[in-house]
Amino acid sequence: MGLGILASRTIRPASRLLQSQTSNFFLRTIVSKPELQSPESAAVSEPEPPTQILPPRNPVGGARVHFSNPEDAIEVFVDGYAVKVPKGFTVLQACEVAGVDIPRFCYHSRLSIAGNCRMCLVEVEKSPKPVASCAMPALPGMKIKTDTPIAKKAREGVMEFLLMNHPLDCPICDQGGECDLQDQSMAFGSDRGRFTEMKRSVVDKNLGPLVKTVMTRCIQCTRCVRFASEVAGVQDLGILGRGSGEEIGTYVEKLMTSELSGNVIDICPVGALTSKPFAFKARNWELKATETIDVSDAVGSNIRVDSRGPEVMRIIPRLNEDINEEWISDKTRFCYDGLKRQRLSDPMIRDSDGRFKAVSWRDALAVVGDIIHQVKPDEIVGVAGQLSDAESMMVLKDFVNRMGSDNVWCEGTAAGVDADLRYSYLMNTSISGLENADLFLLIGTQPRVEAAMVNARICKTVRASNAKVGYVGPPAEFNYDCKHLGTGPDTLKEIAEGRHPFCTALKNAKNPAIIVGAGLFNRTDKNAILSSVESIAQANNVVRPDWNGLNFLLQYAAQAAALDLGLIQQSAKALESAKFVYLMGADDVNVDKIPKDAFVVYQGHHGDKAVYRANVILPASAFTEKEGTYENTEGFTQQTVPAVPTVGDARDDWKIVRALSEVSGVKLPYNSIEGVRSRIKSVAPNLVHTDEREPAAFGPSLKPECKEAMSTTPFQTVVENFYMTNSITRASKIMAQCSAVLLKKPFV
């Protein structure tokens, strides 16, 4: 019997009894209240439901929103949280601001949107099906739900398809432990799969000596394809086929010829692209991470050194929006094996038979101290190498000066370089500021091999705003549209006089940027060239109160600090007349100019070029083994952090020179690195302000006019081999392989 019939039978007797007891009169009483007469008042009088208090959330990855115009802000709701984001933000970005981490494989914040992995599906109110949050723009009032059963089921289904052809070989995969596919399959995937057919396999591709490929693991996210074309500026990778036959590779078998190719290892979310030199060496949880900086060029890219015990195992990039973003060059990433080859571990003295023998520090310093007093003060020369830190250069300068000589300089600072005004050797626009330029004039520099991360900024700007690029110098290969204007000073003269066709574009540019290579400092007519460059800058509104587009791209990590500290060659003939030469890591000095009867002390960490001319060898620590201050090409001061212990009996550079000063009878007045930095503060205060950029205060208007004439000699290539530029890279087996395989490629 139904519940409805049972209820009606139960109610009927009671209703009949009620009818029998009532009279025939019907009374109706109406009670009127003010709330009933006004619906608005009634709504106000009703108690409001209690407001749900949501727990606070923090933006994902420290995401921050900046509104250039408050009217461009729109409000969306993410899981009930009201969030204001700028117009043009995607749903995924809005979720990150709201503190929700959306899973993704194909999306990368620095690459274009592909929307092909579908892992970022979320539910949007009034949408018939889940939407890809990476490609969907956020709209005003949009209500986004990220944790509903529909969104969870959609992601679970996507993950099942992604794992359908994946080999699931995590135990032998180098990506294990830092794999996005591992993490997201655990968090968003199912605990079982329904695929029982045979899995496909893909032939591995040969991309060169740096990147290892296991293409069967590839999930076709196309991050590497987009990175190659959008950031590296090369069209080496592409996608072939469709459906289950889809794969990533090169249409014609070739190597990846970019100087940034190693970055595809970091952005690959699976183990399809891994480091070939690091293969099967270590797991990430076995490594100790140390945040430091790179010294292979003058950019000062932020890096993380992963070590195990006394050995550096790998180098990976560290985020710094102002310098290298999250990319590093292949030279920075893979030169680490040079830190354990050809190292100098003990003090040595050349014997009478021409061979070196190991001695104690006391004996080595005693020999040097005796010899230095046997020569005249003006015959003493000190040269700092391109990898020297500010502390060691300051101590070397003080020591040589106390010995009565002014002949102390750093590699790359030739005689006659004007270091009185910092604007004349710094990148005044700043590296990140290059993105605001709409025209580039490159003079005697090839950023692709001299400073790969500066070149990446230029490439990014050209792609984003179609900025024009003009180049004056020897023929070179660029990875963006560039017009070759000429090869030398004659072209500069035409531009300065307004006779060159490029002058029209230069005149019409709103924010023109001129980048001058530091290789011009070694020319005899450098002052005339720089004067011509400054006249071009003044005539074309390159330098003004709101924009300084006059830039100098330095070549070495030690160059900027050396110029700040005054390590400048006084005479071009100083080396040829020297009787005592102190080379502190200076391997690119022309040792043929050193007299045969001169006594040479080599202080450094590698047995490189100059060590064969040395009479005494003093072992020093490398940049991964010491704390030192460096200033990059834009004037940004940073410090290295020791990641591994020193090799053998090596010591820090400044400590060696400080001990030598005491043995030589000219004891320097500091015993700690803090004391050295106090001395630096009195000479160049900007070098003690770590992680800050000190811009140049003055411009070309204060510089006197140069009367010299420019030579007609064309500009020369500064970097002949991108992979072999200092003692560490020259000792690297990986860099030697790259040089052998890629030497015939255009960019080297």
Swiss-Prot record:
Cellular component GO terms held in the UniProt record: chloroplast; mitochondrial inner membrane; mitochondrial membrane; mitochondrion; plastid; respiratory chain complex I
Which parts of the sequence belong to the 4Fe-4S Mo/W bis-MGD-type domain?
287-343
Reactions mediated catalytically: a ubiquinone + NADH + 5 H(+)(in) = a ubiquinol + NAD(+) + 4 H(+)(out)
Cofactor(s) needed: [2Fe-2S] cluster; [4Fe-4S] cluster
Q: How is the cofactor bound?
A: Binds 1 [2Fe-2S] cluster per subunit. Binds 2 [4Fe-4S] clusters per subunit.
Q: Where in the cell is it found?
A: Mitochondrion inner membrane
Q: What is this protein called?
A: NADH dehydrogenase [ubiquinone] iron-sulfur protein 1, mitochondrial
Gene label? EMB1467
